[in-house]
A protein has these predicted regions:
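Short, solvent-exposed mixed-charge patches
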Residues: 24, 212-213
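Final/C-terminal transmembrane alpha-helix of multipass membrane proteins
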Residues: 188-208
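N- or domain-start disorder-to-order transition segments that initiate the globular core
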Residues: 13-14
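N-terminal signal peptide c-region/cleavage motif recognized by signal peptidases
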Residues: 18-20
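Surface-exposed short loop/turn segments
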Residues: 58, 211-212
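Compositionally biased alpha-helical segments
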Residues: 22-188
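Bacterial N-terminal signal peptides that target proteins for export
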Residues: 1-9
Length: 213
């Protein structure tokens, strides 16, 4: 009887160890947008992957990843490309899509948004100060013009060194990816600049209105 119980306990222990070992195998998922997501796969269907990720603070988060947005999955140093050129709207080959993804990553990491932020801050700040000084309710709409003008500032292209290297089609894919990412970054930072400008300008405008009353 004791021997039988010991065998069962040993079997359960082996199952537990093997399950834990499997669960700790991380996958690195490269998205078509250039994001890299690292986590433990929990489940997978034809449409999505259920991934468990752990943040730097130790907090665990469960993500549902759309498989159609995945370029490749790397596990144990081996990359498996999931991207299918035939089902892609871009028409990029696997090699060209790599350049497109690299462009998105560089645009997100390297593109400077100083001018859009300053422009959106000044435009929204000036409008907020003006409308706030007159105690007009439209002061809350001040971020909109600043965001629009900041987003329209020029400069979504990569550096000449990166834009002019490589084969023509790969070069075009890289530039397209960079411009897409740079545009989104510029819009987001313009929104932040406009909101900050509205707050600063609104405080100044309301202070002026208060001193005049």
């Amino acid at each position: 009887m004791i021997q039988k119980i010991s065998s069962i306990l040993l079997l359960l222990l082996l199952l537990l160890v093997s399950n834990n070992g499997f669960a700790q195998i991380n996958q690195s998922i490269l998205m078509l947008g250039g994001q890299e997501i690292i986590g433990v796969p929990l489940d997978q269907s034809p449409e999505e992957i259920v991934l468990k990720t752990t943040k730097k603070n130790g907090k665990v988060k469960i993500l549902l990843i759309d498989i159609s947005r995945v370029f490749s999955v790397t596990q144990n140093g081996q990359e498996e490309v999931w991207y299918n050129p035939d089902s892609s709207e871009t028409g990029y080959s696997i090699k060209e899509m790599r350049y497109y993804i690299k462009g998105q990553q560089d645009g997100r990491n390297e593109h400077k948004t100083t001018l859009p932020v300053i422009t959106s801050f000044l435009v929204s700040g000036a409008l907020a100060a003006l409308t706030g000084s007159q105690e007009l309710a439209v002061v809350v709409l001040s971020p909109i013009p600043g965001t629009l003008i900041g987003s329209l500032t020029k400069g979504n292209m990569p550096s000449n060194e990166k834009a002019n290297g490589g084969e023509p089609m790969s070069q075009a894919a890289y530039i397209a990816g960079y411009k897409q990412s740079a545009r989104m970054k510029k819009i987001f930072h313009s929104i932040l600049g406009s909101v900050a400008g509205t707050v600063a300008g609104g405080i100044i405008g309301l202070s002026i209105a208060s001193s005049n009353s």
